[in-house]
Amino acid sequence: MAEPIPVWPGEFVRLDDGEIFVRTAAPPGATAGPGGDAAPAVFVHGFGGSSTNWTDLMHLLSSAGSGAGPALWCDALDLPGFGQSLPTEASCSVSGQAATVAALIEARGRGPVHLFGNSLGGAVCTRVAATRPELVRTLTLIAPAMPDLLVRPATARFPALCVPKFGGWLLSRVQKMSPQARVEASIATIYYDGSCVHPDRIAGDIAEIERRDQLGYGPAVLVRCARSIVAEYLRRGATSLWRDAARVNSPALIIYGSHDRIVDPRMAGRAARTFRRARVVVLPRTGHVAQMERPAAVAAEFRGLLAGNEPLPVPVV
Protein backbone atom coordinates (compact mmCIF):
# COMPACT_ATOMS: atom_id res chain seq x y z
CA MET A 1 0.00 0.00 0.00
CA ALA A 2 1.47 3.35 -1.09
CA GLU A 3 2.10 6.08 1.44
CA PRO A 4 -0.89 8.44 1.62
CA ILE A 5 -0.73 12.02 0.43
CA PRO A 6 -0.51 14.44 3.38
CA VAL A 7 -3.51 16.68 3.92
CA TRP A 8 -3.28 19.99 2.13
CA PRO A 9 -2.38 23.14 4.07
CA GLY A 10 -5.13 25.57 4.89
CA GLU A 11 -6.08 28.91 6.31
CA PHE A 12 -9.08 30.64 7.82
CA VAL A 13 -11.07 32.80 5.41
CA ARG A 14 -13.28 35.53 6.85
CA LEU A 15 -16.84 35.75 5.57
CA ASP A 16 -19.68 38.01 6.69
CA ASP A 17 -20.96 35.58 9.35
CA GLY A 18 -17.61 34.26 10.59
CA GLU A 19 -14.51 32.38 9.52
CA ILE A 20 -14.27 29.08 7.70
CA PHE A 21 -11.22 26.90 7.23
CA VAL A 22 -10.13 26.25 3.64
CA ARG A 23 -7.46 23.83 2.39
CA THR A 24 -5.79 24.60 -0.93
CA ALA A 25 -3.95 22.52 -3.54
CA ALA A 26 -2.52 24.62 -6.35
CA PRO A 27 0.57 24.59 -8.56
CA PRO A 28 3.42 26.77 -7.24
CA GLY A 29 3.21 30.25 -8.68
CA ALA A 30 -0.18 29.67 -10.29
CA THR A 31 -3.03 32.15 -10.18
CA ALA A 32 -6.73 31.42 -10.34
CA GLY A 33 -9.67 33.27 -11.78
CA PRO A 34 -9.97 35.66 -14.73
CA GLY A 35 -6.64 35.83 -16.51
CA GLY A 36 -5.13 33.16 -14.26
CA ASP A 37 -3.44 29.98 -15.38
CA ALA A 38 -5.40 27.59 -13.12
CA ALA A 39 -9.18 27.24 -13.24
CA PRO A 40 -10.71 27.54 -9.75
CA ALA A 41 -12.51 24.63 -8.10
CA VAL A 42 -14.33 24.40 -4.77
CA PHE A 43 -15.00 21.15 -2.89
CA VAL A 44 -17.78 20.60 -0.32
CA HIS A 45 -17.76 17.59 2.02
CA GLY A 46 -20.67 15.59 3.39
CA PHE A 47 -22.37 15.01 6.74
CA GLY A 48 -19.76 14.49 9.45
CA GLY A 49 -16.91 15.00 6.97
CA SER A 50 -14.33 17.69 6.41
CA SER A 51 -12.07 19.22 3.78
CA THR A 52 -9.62 16.32 4.17
CA ASN A 53 -12.14 14.07 2.38
CA TRP A 54 -10.91 15.63 -0.88
CA THR A 55 -7.14 15.20 -0.38
CA ASP A 56 -6.53 12.58 -3.07
CA LEU A 57 -8.83 14.06 -5.70
CA MET A 58 -7.32 17.52 -5.17
CA HIS A 59 -3.90 15.95 -5.74
CA LEU A 60 -5.02 14.51 -9.07
CA LEU A 61 -6.82 17.62 -10.30
CA SER A 62 -4.16 20.13 -9.32
CA SER A 63 -0.86 20.19 -11.18
CA ALA A 64 0.66 18.24 -8.30
CA GLY A 65 -1.23 15.23 -9.61
CA SER A 66 0.37 15.50 -13.05
CA GLY A 67 -2.89 14.40 -14.64
CA ALA A 68 -4.03 15.05 -18.17
CA GLY A 69 -5.97 18.21 -18.84
CA PRO A 70 -5.82 21.66 -17.28
CA ALA A 71 -4.69 21.99 -13.68
CA LEU A 72 -7.20 23.28 -11.16
CA TRP A 73 -6.73 25.63 -8.23
CA CYS A 74 -8.47 23.53 -5.60
CA ASP A 75 -10.11 24.96 -2.46
CA ALA A 76 -11.85 22.56 -0.05
CA LEU A 77 -13.74 24.11 2.84
CA ASP A 78 -14.80 22.85 6.24
CA LEU A 79 -18.50 23.68 6.48
CA PRO A 80 -19.37 25.63 9.65
CA GLY A 81 -19.28 23.29 12.63
CA PHE A 82 -17.16 20.67 10.85
CA GLY A 83 -13.42 20.20 10.64
CA GLN A 84 -11.66 23.35 11.82
CA SER A 85 -14.61 25.71 11.23
CA LEU A 86 -16.70 26.92 14.14
CA PRO A 87 -20.51 26.68 13.88
CA THR A 88 -22.67 29.69 13.11
CA GLU A 89 -26.34 30.29 13.85
CA ALA A 90 -27.68 29.60 10.34
CA SER A 91 -24.96 27.22 9.20
CA CYS A 92 -26.71 23.86 9.55
CA SER A 93 -29.48 24.24 6.98
CA VAL A 94 -28.82 23.29 3.37
CA SER A 95 -29.65 26.84 2.31
CA GLY A 96 -27.38 28.26 5.01
CA GLN A 97 -24.52 26.02 3.92
CA ALA A 98 -25.15 26.96 0.28
CA ALA A 99 -24.90 30.61 1.28
CA THR A 100 -21.55 29.88 2.94
CA VAL A 101 -20.22 28.21 -0.21
CA ALA A 102 -21.43 31.09 -2.38
CA ALA A 103 -19.85 33.60 0.00
CA LEU A 104 -16.52 31.76 -0.20
CA ILE A 105 -16.57 31.80 -4.00
CA GLU A 106 -17.30 35.51 -3.94
CA ALA A 107 -14.64 36.19 -1.30
CA ARG A 108 -12.01 34.43 -3.38
CA GLY A 109 -12.96 36.63 -6.35
CA ARG A 110 -11.90 34.13 -8.98
CA GLY A 111 -15.03 33.97 -11.08
CA PRO A 112 -17.20 30.90 -11.71
CA VAL A 113 -15.75 27.68 -10.29
CA HIS A 114 -15.83 23.97 -10.92
CA LEU A 115 -18.01 23.00 -7.94
CA PHE A 116 -17.73 19.55 -6.33
CA GLY A 117 -19.94 18.10 -3.59
CA ASN A 118 -20.25 14.74 -1.85
CA SER A 119 -23.40 13.49 -0.08
CA LEU A 120 -24.80 16.43 1.93
CA GLY A 121 -22.27 18.58 0.08
CA GLY A 122 -23.88 17.42 -3.16
CA ALA A 123 -27.25 18.75 -2.03
CA VAL A 124 -25.60 22.01 -0.97
CA CYS A 125 -23.84 22.39 -4.32
CA THR A 126 -27.05 21.66 -6.21
CA ARG A 127 -28.70 24.56 -4.41
CA VAL A 128 -25.74 26.84 -5.16
CA ALA A 129 -25.84 25.93 -8.86
CA ALA A 130 -29.61 26.48 -9.03
CA THR A 131 -29.75 29.76 -7.13
CA ARG A 132 -26.38 31.30 -8.00
CA PRO A 133 -25.66 30.03 -11.53
CA GLU A 134 -23.19 32.84 -12.22
CA LEU A 135 -20.83 31.27 -9.66
CA VAL A 136 -20.71 27.77 -11.17
CA ARG A 137 -18.78 26.68 -14.25
CA THR A 138 -19.41 22.95 -13.89
CA LEU A 139 -21.10 20.88 -11.18
CA THR A 140 -19.74 17.51 -10.00
CA LEU A 141 -21.83 15.57 -7.48
CA ILE A 142 -20.66 12.37 -5.80
CA ALA A 143 -23.47 10.36 -4.20
CA PRO A 144 -25.54 13.53 -3.70
CA ALA A 145 -28.03 13.41 -0.83
CA MET A 146 -31.07 14.15 -2.97
CA PRO A 147 -34.51 13.34 -1.56
CA ASP A 148 -35.39 9.64 -1.57
CA LEU A 149 -38.06 8.50 0.85
CA LEU A 150 -36.98 4.85 0.71
CA VAL A 151 -34.86 4.57 3.86
CA ARG A 152 -31.77 2.37 3.51
CA PRO A 153 -30.54 0.20 6.42
CA ALA A 154 -27.41 2.32 6.88
CA THR A 155 -29.50 5.48 7.31
CA ALA A 156 -32.38 4.02 9.33
CA ARG A 157 -31.30 5.90 12.46
CA PHE A 158 -31.03 9.21 10.65
CA PRO A 159 -34.64 10.38 11.18
CA ALA A 160 -34.28 9.44 14.85
CA LEU A 161 -31.64 12.14 15.23
CA CYS A 162 -34.39 14.69 14.54
CA VAL A 163 -36.53 13.68 17.52
CA PRO A 164 -36.15 16.22 20.35
CA LYS A 165 -33.97 14.87 23.18
CA PHE A 166 -33.85 11.39 21.63
CA GLY A 167 -31.43 12.53 18.92
CA GLY A 168 -29.01 13.87 21.49
CA TRP A 169 -29.35 10.70 23.55
CA LEU A 170 -28.62 8.57 20.50
CA LEU A 171 -25.49 10.54 19.68
CA SER A 172 -24.35 10.32 23.30
CA ARG A 173 -24.46 6.53 22.99
CA VAL A 174 -22.36 6.73 19.83
CA GLN A 175 -19.85 8.95 21.62
CA LYS A 176 -19.43 6.29 24.29
CA MET A 177 -17.84 4.11 21.61
CA SER A 178 -14.09 4.44 21.37
CA PRO A 179 -12.78 6.75 18.62
CA GLN A 180 -11.25 3.72 16.91
CA ALA A 181 -14.57 1.85 16.95
CA ARG A 182 -16.34 4.88 15.47
CA VAL A 183 -13.79 5.19 12.67
CA GLU A 184 -14.02 1.47 11.89
CA ALA A 185 -17.83 1.67 11.80
CA SER A 186 -17.69 4.67 9.47
CA ILE A 187 -15.27 2.96 7.09
CA ALA A 188 -17.47 -0.15 7.01
CA THR A 189 -20.45 2.02 6.06
CA ILE A 190 -19.06 4.43 3.49
CA TYR A 191 -16.52 2.27 1.63
CA TYR A 192 -17.13 -0.73 -0.61
CA ASP A 193 -13.73 -2.10 0.44
CA GLY A 194 -12.37 -0.53 3.60
CA SER A 195 -9.06 -2.35 3.23
CA CYS A 196 -7.97 0.40 0.82
CA VAL A 197 -7.74 2.91 3.69
CA HIS A 198 -4.12 3.40 4.76
CA PRO A 199 -3.38 2.87 8.49
CA ASP A 200 -1.98 6.42 8.67
CA ARG A 201 -5.32 7.78 7.44
CA ILE A 202 -7.14 5.72 10.07
CA ALA A 203 -4.82 7.07 12.77
CA GLY A 204 -5.48 10.60 11.55
CA ASP A 205 -9.24 10.06 11.65
CA ILE A 206 -9.02 8.71 15.20
CA ALA A 207 -7.00 11.74 16.30
CA GLU A 208 -9.55 14.06 14.68
CA ILE A 209 -12.44 12.40 16.54
CA GLU A 210 -10.52 12.73 19.80
CA ARG A 211 -9.97 16.43 19.07
CA ARG A 212 -13.61 17.09 18.19
CA ASP A 213 -14.84 15.23 21.27
CA GLN A 214 -13.22 18.00 23.32
CA LEU A 215 -15.00 20.83 21.50
CA GLY A 216 -18.47 20.33 22.94
CA TYR A 217 -20.54 21.50 19.98
CA GLY A 218 -20.13 18.47 17.69
CA PRO A 219 -23.29 16.51 18.65
CA ALA A 220 -25.51 19.61 18.46
CA VAL A 221 -24.19 20.41 14.97
CA LEU A 222 -24.89 16.86 13.80
CA VAL A 223 -28.45 16.93 15.17
CA ARG A 224 -29.18 20.30 13.56
CA CYS A 225 -27.76 19.16 10.22
CA ALA A 226 -29.74 15.90 10.38
CA ARG A 227 -32.95 17.86 10.94
CA SER A 228 -32.12 20.09 7.98
CA ILE A 229 -31.53 17.10 5.69
CA VAL A 230 -34.79 15.42 6.72
CA ALA A 231 -36.64 18.71 6.19
CA GLU A 232 -35.20 18.90 2.66
CA TYR A 233 -36.25 15.33 1.95
CA LEU A 234 -39.82 16.19 2.95
CA ARG A 235 -39.93 19.54 1.16
CA ARG A 236 -42.24 19.80 -1.84
CA GLY A 237 -42.88 22.46 -4.45
CA ALA A 238 -40.71 25.06 -6.11
CA THR A 239 -38.07 25.11 -3.37
CA SER A 240 -37.37 21.37 -3.26
CA LEU A 241 -33.94 19.99 -4.10
CA TRP A 242 -35.21 18.10 -7.15
CA ARG A 243 -36.74 21.34 -8.46
CA ASP A 244 -33.34 22.93 -7.85
CA ALA A 245 -31.75 20.12 -9.86
CA ALA A 246 -34.08 20.80 -12.78
CA ARG A 247 -33.00 24.45 -12.76
CA VAL A 248 -29.27 23.73 -12.94
CA ASN A 249 -28.01 24.80 -16.35
CA SER A 250 -24.27 24.22 -15.95
CA PRO A 251 -22.71 20.99 -17.27
CA ALA A 252 -23.06 18.39 -14.53
CA LEU A 253 -21.27 15.16 -13.65
CA ILE A 254 -23.17 12.97 -11.19
CA ILE A 255 -21.35 9.93 -9.82
CA TYR A 256 -22.89 7.09 -7.84
CA GLY A 257 -21.25 4.06 -6.27
CA SER A 258 -22.68 0.67 -7.20
CA HIS A 259 -22.37 -0.52 -3.58
CA ASP A 260 -23.30 2.70 -1.78
CA ARG A 261 -25.04 1.83 1.50
CA ILE A 262 -26.29 5.39 2.07
CA VAL A 263 -27.44 6.80 -1.29
CA ASP A 264 -29.24 4.32 -3.54
CA PRO A 265 -27.32 4.09 -6.86
CA ARG A 266 -30.64 3.56 -8.61
CA MET A 267 -31.16 7.29 -8.10
CA ALA A 268 -28.86 7.68 -11.10
CA GLY A 269 -31.88 7.26 -13.37
CA ARG A 270 -33.79 10.12 -11.79
CA ALA A 271 -30.68 12.31 -11.83
CA ALA A 272 -30.22 11.65 -15.55
CA ARG A 273 -33.84 12.63 -16.20
CA THR A 274 -33.77 15.74 -14.01
CA PHE A 275 -30.47 17.55 -14.53
CA ARG A 276 -30.54 19.27 -17.92
CA ARG A 277 -26.94 18.70 -18.99
CA ALA A 278 -25.94 15.67 -16.98
CA ARG A 279 -23.21 13.10 -17.41
CA VAL A 280 -24.32 10.34 -15.00
CA VAL A 281 -21.99 7.51 -14.01
CA VAL A 282 -22.27 4.54 -11.66
CA LEU A 283 -18.81 3.35 -10.63
CA PRO A 284 -18.59 -0.40 -9.97
CA ARG A 285 -17.18 -1.73 -6.69
CA THR A 286 -17.54 1.69 -5.09
CA GLY A 287 -19.23 2.95 -1.94
CA HIS A 288 -20.44 6.35 -0.77
CA VAL A 289 -17.18 8.30 -1.06
CA ALA A 290 -15.86 7.67 -4.57
CA GLN A 291 -13.48 10.64 -4.28
CA MET A 292 -11.74 8.80 -1.43
CA GLU A 293 -12.11 5.21 -2.60
CA ARG A 294 -11.58 5.67 -6.35
CA PRO A 295 -10.14 9.17 -6.87
CA ALA A 296 -8.47 8.30 -10.19
CA ALA A 297 -11.80 7.16 -11.65
CA VAL A 298 -13.51 10.34 -10.46
CA ALA A 299 -10.72 12.49 -11.92
CA ALA A 300 -11.00 10.65 -15.25
CA GLU A 301 -14.76 11.18 -15.38
CA PHE A 302 -14.32 14.88 -14.61
CA ARG A 303 -11.75 15.20 -17.38
CA GLY A 304 -14.28 13.50 -19.65
CA LEU A 305 -16.89 16.09 -18.67
CA LEU A 306 -14.51 18.90 -19.63
CA ALA A 307 -13.61 17.20 -22.90
CA GLY A 308 -17.23 16.45 -23.76
CA ASN A 309 -16.61 12.71 -23.95
CA GLU A 310 -19.35 10.18 -23.45
CA PRO A 311 -19.45 8.65 -19.95
CA LEU A 312 -18.50 5.05 -19.40
CA PRO A 313 -21.42 2.58 -19.60
CA VAL A 314 -23.54 2.50 -16.45
CA PRO A 315 -23.54 -1.04 -15.01
CA VAL A 316 -26.74 -2.68 -13.85
CA VAL A 317 -26.94 -2.57 -10.03
Predicted regions: what they are:
Residues 175-244:
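Conserved alpha/beta-hydrolase catalytic His-Asp/Glu region
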Residues 38, 46-50, 119:
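Active-site glycine-rich loops that stabilize anionic/oxyanionic intermediates
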Residues 44-46, 256:
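The conserved beta1-alpha1 loop
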Residues 130, 137-173, 177:
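Flexible "cap/lid" loop of the alpha/beta hydrolase fold
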Residues 269, 274-317:
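Catalytic active-site module of serine/aspartate enzymes centered on a nucleophile-bearing elbow/loop
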Residues 233-235, 259-263:
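Acidic catalytic loop of the alpha/beta-hydrolase fold
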Residues 8-11, 15-30, 35, 55-62, ...:
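Active-site loop/oxyanion-hole signature of alpha/beta-hydrolase fold enzymes
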